[in-house]
Amino acid sequence: CIRDSYLATAGRAVARELLVYRYNQLDKAIENAAKLGFRDGAALYPMVTVNGEECHNEWEITFEEIHRNGAVAYAIFNYIRYTGDTAYLADCGLEVLLSVARFWAQRITWSGARRKYVMLGVTGPNEYENNVDNNWYTSYIACWSMRYAAESAAWVRENRPADYARICAKRRFDETAETKRWLEIADGMYFLSLIHISE
């Protein structure tokens, strides 16, 4: 979403505006997810858009290249890490992170056979294999996003309590219940290894 080189050369204000753009498209991302059956404020950012709605016409990309949600979350992390602008997290970023984490928590399923959480029917960022199960990158960025959302919620609660209360009311966020679920999924995620690939 925002490259390190761009952060280093374009200036903090420009980089922040790119993330504010993502925040301004959040309600459309929630609508996009709702069209696919997701609920409770889960968001799926579009692969291609002019107004926040998905404009891509290849279903594998639209429905399966969902790692893009992780790129949005990582852009927030990277921007704050690089600039120190923690105000962005309370102003805009946490709402995006909560909605992305809600998407992952609903998209990931439990496998009784593996006794782990799995990610079925995705296309990874290399686009070489479509409609695969347990793409390592997609599973990893999903788990990372849920953990980062939980950490960010705790940070905003402790450091910006008025903003935290506003966000909880606006997004109907129950930190205790939701973050418990996110961390349970992240801790129990199945990841392919060389042993599993050779089986």
Where are these regions (language model features)?
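Well-ordered alpha-helical scaffold segments within catalytic/enzyme domains
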Residues: 3-13, 60, 71-86, 103, ...
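Helix-terminus loop motifs that line ligand-binding clefts
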Residues: 13-74, 80, 87-91, 100, ...
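Catalytic cores of glycan-processing enzymes that make or break glycosidic bonds
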Residues: 50-56, 115-122, 139, 170-182, ...
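Acidic/histidine-rich catalytic neighborhood
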Residues: 103-173
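Alpha-helical scaffold segments in carbohydrate-active enzymes
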Residues: 21-28, 95-107, 144, 148-151, ...
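Conserved small/polar residues in nucleotide/adenosyl-binding loops
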Residues: 1-2, 195-199
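Hydrophobic packing residues in well-ordered alpha-helices of helical domains and bundles
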Residues: 15, 93, 179-182
